[in-house]
């Protein structure tokens, strides 16, 4: 059971199970709204009584809900958007625009104005339709000379009629650009464009049209050139009119060079997600400057006479000839082959692809860029402080000394630790002496061959640490003439006995004493003199007693060091 309620001639059937809910909402809101209004808001709120109550409470009570007649007038003039009973712009409610679901097309269009000047009229797919394929935007501009007896309305009805028969989903024309006003608004050259959403795969196969004869005109190539020359004065305003006054302009940085046509026309929100997906999936937009609409196999012909291809132009150079039918192409540009008869010659416009996937407008003049046109590349993203070293460098060398760092990785320290350590010696001293070079041994003079010979000292650049270098006399068996000089040298290796003795070495030699240098005059008792080892006496076997000999090799005993007078 349902209840019929309404005011102002409108009849709305309310289900019986919702009568109690609507009655409760009406009591909460103060009985200021009719059942029809409450039911309309209830459907808009997706059958949520709480949201319906809140929405009705925020509505202004000083204005009555518009009647059905007023809503019909509003739908006939879609220039003015309903703003609710409050008149507030910030209240996002489509309640006043909905006439119980009958004007859903106007509500879903979000206020898009589809008004066409001239003799053309705008048409779109049905509201309750579903379309699985992406429609191609087909626009047929004037001037087109038609035979007598055939009007634009008949042609339009013939094109739209198969679409009305198919269950296709609504594809608003405002999705192609930022506003549908771009698509349908005529240019200054008085070219009216008819925008039709056509899907080739969903049209029935038994429809045939006589539209082919009306559009196949042998003199269209000349008319296209004339229309392009006339439209060139518009400076491609069709791409730049998308809500210029309402939305802020895009400000380009100084280092980015853009075309002059985009400096004042590109605004925020010019391209939505559907537009980018449409351009990226098809890779080109099918327009029809001089559309040759043909009906073959029962399909509503998609006009593909003027195919604007997106090509990758490295030099951004395009040579367009507006006065002739020839087009000069760069080596890296491609143009799809033409369809139709040979008499219909159409000049293909080649546009460079851009990062924003801009679709070519069908009634736009050819775009000509200056020679050697270049776009400055965007600056590469850098760190905030612009680190001049790579990320794997470790700039904490002074705090973490690389004692255990392997050699291949020590270069990553930004400190002296990572560089090769220089020698602390003078440049000439740290180099090894070549073989055979003379080493000046000063104060070396031949002495007596009595006792054990003291070691031969070689002066070097290091300072004395625990001992003093005291040159002493040495006995050297001179066999060469140069060794008899005052300064003598030797090229043989030094043995352990020739090292300068010092308590720092902590050596204990067996069978021979350690030779200490000569005692200094100022420091007594610190060193002891070398005691020579007496040679054993040669005694004949007759007189040699049995037992140990009376004369033995006496080992030197270290004397006590007298340090009392040295400080």
Swiss-Prot record:
Gene Ontology annotations for the cellular component aspect, listed alphabetically: nucleus
Subcellular location: Nucleus
Family statement drawn from the similarity comment of this UniProt entry: Belongs to the GIP1 family.
Main location: nucleus
Gene Ontology process terms (BP): positive regulation of DNA binding
UniProt cross-references to PANTHER family, sorted A to Z: FLOCCULATION PROTEIN (DUF1296) (PTHR46775), GBF-INTERACTING PROTEIN 1 (PTHR46775:SF5)
Organism domain of life: Eukaryota
Compositionally biased residues, Polar residues: 91-102, 121-136, 550-567
Record field: compositional bias (Basic and acidic residues): 182-191
Paired cysteines (S-S): none
Native source organism of the sequence: Arabidopsis thaliana
Region (Disordered): 70-150, 164-192, 545-567
Keyword terms, alphabetized: Chaperone, Nucleus
Lineage of origin: Eukaryota, Viridiplantae, Streptophyta, Embryophyta, Tracheophyta
Tissue specificity comment: Expressed in roots, leaves, stems and flowers.
Description of how the protein assembles with itself and partners: Monomer, homodimer, homooligomer. Under non-reducing conditions, predominantly present in high molecular weight forms, but predominates in low molecular weight monomers under reducing conditions. Interacts with BZIP16, BZIP68 and GBF1. Interacts with LBD18.
Stated role: Plant specific protein that enhances G-box-binding factor (GBF) DNA binding activity. May function as a nuclear chaperone or lever and regulate the multimeric state of GBFs. May contribute to bZIP-mediated gene regulation. Is able to refold denatured rhodanese in vitro. Reduces DNA-binding activity of BZIP16, BZIP68 and GBF1 under non-reducing conditions through direct physical interaction. Acts as a negative co-regulator in red and blue light-mediated hypocotyl elongation.
Gene: GIP1
Protein name (record): GBF-interacting protein 1
MF terms (GO), sorted A to Z: identical protein binding; unfolded protein binding
């Amino acid at each position: 059971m349902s209840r019929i309620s309404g005011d102002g001639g409108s009849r709305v059937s309310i289900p019986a199970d919702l009568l109690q809910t609507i009655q409760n909402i009406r009591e909460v809101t103060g009985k200021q709204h009719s059942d029809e209004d409450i039911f309309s808001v209830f459907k808009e709120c997706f059958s949520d009584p709480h949201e319906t109550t809140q929405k009705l409470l925020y509505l202004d009570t000083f204005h009555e809900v518009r009647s059905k007649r007023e809503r019909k007038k509003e739908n006939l003039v879609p220039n003015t958007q309903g703003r609710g009973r409050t008149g507030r712009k910030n209240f996002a409610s489509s309640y006043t625009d909905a006439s119980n679901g009958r004007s859903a097309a106007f509500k879903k269009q979000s206020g898009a104005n589809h008004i066409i000047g001239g003799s053309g009229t705008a048409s779109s797919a049905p509201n309750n339709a579903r379309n699985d394929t992406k429609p191609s935007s087909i626009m047929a501009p004037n001037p087109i000379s038609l035979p007598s007896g055939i009007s634009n309305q008949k042609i339009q009805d013939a094109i739209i009629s198969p679409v009305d028969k198919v269950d296709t989903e609504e594809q608003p024309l405002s999705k192609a650009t930022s506003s549908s006003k771009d698509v349908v608004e005529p240019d200054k050259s008085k070219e009216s464009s008819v925008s039709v959403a056509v899907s080739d795969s969903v049209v029935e196969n038994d429809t045939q049209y006589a539209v082919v004869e009306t559009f196949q005109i042998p003199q269209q190539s000349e008319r296209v050139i004339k229309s392009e020359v006339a439209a060139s004065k518009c400076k491609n305003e069709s791409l730049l009119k998308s809500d210029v006054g309402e939305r802020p302009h895009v400000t380009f940085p100084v280092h980015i060079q853009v075309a002059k046509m985009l400096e004042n026309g590109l605004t925020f929100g010019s391209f939505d997600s559907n537009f980018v997906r449409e351009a990226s999936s098809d890779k080109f937009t099918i327009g029809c400057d001089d559309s040759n609409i043909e009906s073959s196999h029962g399909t509503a012909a998609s006009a593909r006479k003027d195919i604007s291809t997106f090509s990758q132009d490295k030099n951004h150079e395009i040579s367009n000839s507006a006065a002739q039918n020839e087009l000069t192409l760069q080596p890296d540009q491609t143009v799809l082959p033409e369809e139709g008869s040979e008499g219909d010659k159409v000049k293909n416009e080649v546009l460079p692809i851009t990062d924003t996937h801009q679709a070519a407008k069908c009634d736009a003049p050819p775009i000509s860029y200056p020679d050697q046109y270049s776009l400055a590349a965007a600056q590469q993203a850098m760190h905030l402080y612009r680190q001049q070293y790579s990320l794997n460098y470790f700039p904490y060398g002074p705090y973490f000394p690389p004692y255990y760092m392997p050699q291949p990785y020590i270069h990553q320290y930004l400190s002296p630790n990572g560089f090769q350590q220089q020698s602390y010696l003078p440049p000439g001293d740290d180099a090894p002496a070549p073989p055979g070079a003379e080493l000046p041994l000063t104060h070396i003079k031949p002495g007596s061959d009595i006792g054990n010979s003291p070691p031969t000292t070689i002066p070097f650049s290091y300072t004395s640490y625990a001992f003093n270098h005291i040159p002493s006399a040495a006995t050297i068996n001179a066999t060469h003439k140069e060794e008899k000089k005052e300064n003598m040298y030797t090229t043989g290796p030094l043995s352990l006995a020739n090292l300068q003795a010092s308590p720092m070495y902590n050596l204990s030699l067996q069978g021979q004493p350690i030779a200490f240098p000569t005692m200094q005059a100022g420091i007594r008792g610190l060193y002891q003199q070398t005691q020579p080892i007496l040679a054993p006496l040669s005694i004949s076997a007759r007189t040699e007693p049995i037992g140990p000999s009376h004369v033995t090799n006496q080992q030197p005993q270290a004397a006590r060091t007298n340090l009392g007078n040295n400080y």
